[in-house]
Amino acid sequence: MPPRDSYSYAAPPSAQLHEVDTPQEHDKKELVIGDRAYDVTNFVKRHPGGKIIAYQVGTDATDAYKQFHVRSAKADKMLKSLPSRPVHKGYSPRRADLIADFQEFTKQLEAEGMFEPSLPHVAYRLAEVIAMHVAGAALIWHGYTFAGIAMLGVVQGRCGWLMHEGGHYSLTGNIAFDRAIQVACYGLGCGMSGAWWRNQHNKHHATPQKLQHDVDLDTLPLVAFHERIAAKVKSPAMKAWLSMQAKLFAPVTTLLVALGWQLYLHPRHMLRTKHYDELAMLGIRYGLVGYLAANYGAGYVLACYLLYVQLGAMYIFCNFAVSHTHLPVVEPNEHATWVEYAANHTTNCSPSWWCDWWMSYLNYQIEHHLYPSMPQFRHPKIAPRVKQLFEKHGLHYDVRGYFEAMADTFANLDNVAHAPEKKMQ
């Protein structure tokens, strides 16, 4: 089945939770998990994962719940404590056959051990970022300044990939250990907050490319990935900026985003939420920068630091952008199934040894969205079977060459920037 320019889904409730003509409490918030409807009216505000749970109200949240809480016994205990009732006798979710096959496929993967962590792989990943930091510092020490900064810029991105997997708890399988790895990698390696990232990134996973839900679409004033987002801009200065966004995105916008996160957004979140472990990581990172500035000149060190951040930001943000930003969006009042979000609003980049390493297996973005808690190095093993599942149910399995996907990303930036002009012609 070929891809489409747009998709239409049922508006929530996407599953008929009640018997027809049964009186309902209009302010009650329910969602379905398994064969029960759970009343989350009073739980939404105290949900440990934040308001992401509100995105599932009125829908069958079985797959979302399972994939977000693969390793959390605490979540199951909380779920059992909530008021619930059996779903009515005639209940059937949207795309029931697809959901049933996906859940059966998931059970097969669990039986095969695909969700089990690999400690040797974790050791390799940690050793890699340590070795690359040492190599970058050694290059600079021996006078190869630009080569050393380039190495450190790339490993900054590698820390981003590693913390991403830690934030999904798919490294060691122990939530506390994975969070510790994420805090260290993201704080020391990138100067950012793992707690902030987890809160925001899970919203993206819950509803990728859904307007007013996916935080990855909430990118103004620096960039707009969709015409509907760009249409919000009224300022002539911002319109002028967006008109050049395809040219500015890689060299300038990514740097501004990184600096905004490092110097304002993430430290503010750490202070507000009292994540002192993350603040300690920042203290070590910027203590080292201060030491270097005191001994080698503030201007020189600042210039090197900005180049280092720019290279790392360009590496990671451009690679994140290829997976979704040029694909169709979901309307705010519609809701796709978990599998449809992965199929219709996500693209893979063609596998190869270098692309698998360069994107740290996130070129298998479809598999990652289906199974965010699966160790990412196992995605190549399941990809052919995911494709078969999609083909059986008439879904498009979108795979593009890396450079094709990158070209589509920048073409979309340009099209969005000039959409108002084209409409006037």
Swiss-Prot record:
Q: Which GO terms describe its molecular function?
A: acyl-lipid (8-3)-desaturase activity; heme binding; metal ion binding; oxidoreductase activity, acting on paired donors, with oxidation of a pair of donors resulting in the reduction of molecular oxygen to two molecules of water
The record places domain Cytochrome b5 heme-binding at 18-93
Motif Histidine box-3: which ranges? 365-369
The record's section on PROSITE patterns has: CYTOCHROME_B5_1, CYTOCHROME_B5_2
Q: Which cofactor does it need?
A: Fe(2+)
Transmembrane spans? 134-154, 175-197, 241-261, 297-317
Q: Using the UniProt record, give the first listed, main subcellular location.
A: membrane
Short motif Histidine box-1, span: 164-168
Function, as annotated, reads: Fatty acid desaturase that introduces a cis double bond at the 5-position in 20-carbon polyunsaturated fatty acids incorporated in a glycerolipid that contain a Delta(8) double bond.
Identify the PANTHER family for this entry: DELTA(5) FATTY ACID DESATURASE FAT-4, FATTY ACID DESATURASE 2
Which protein are we looking at? Acyl-lipid (8-3)-desaturase
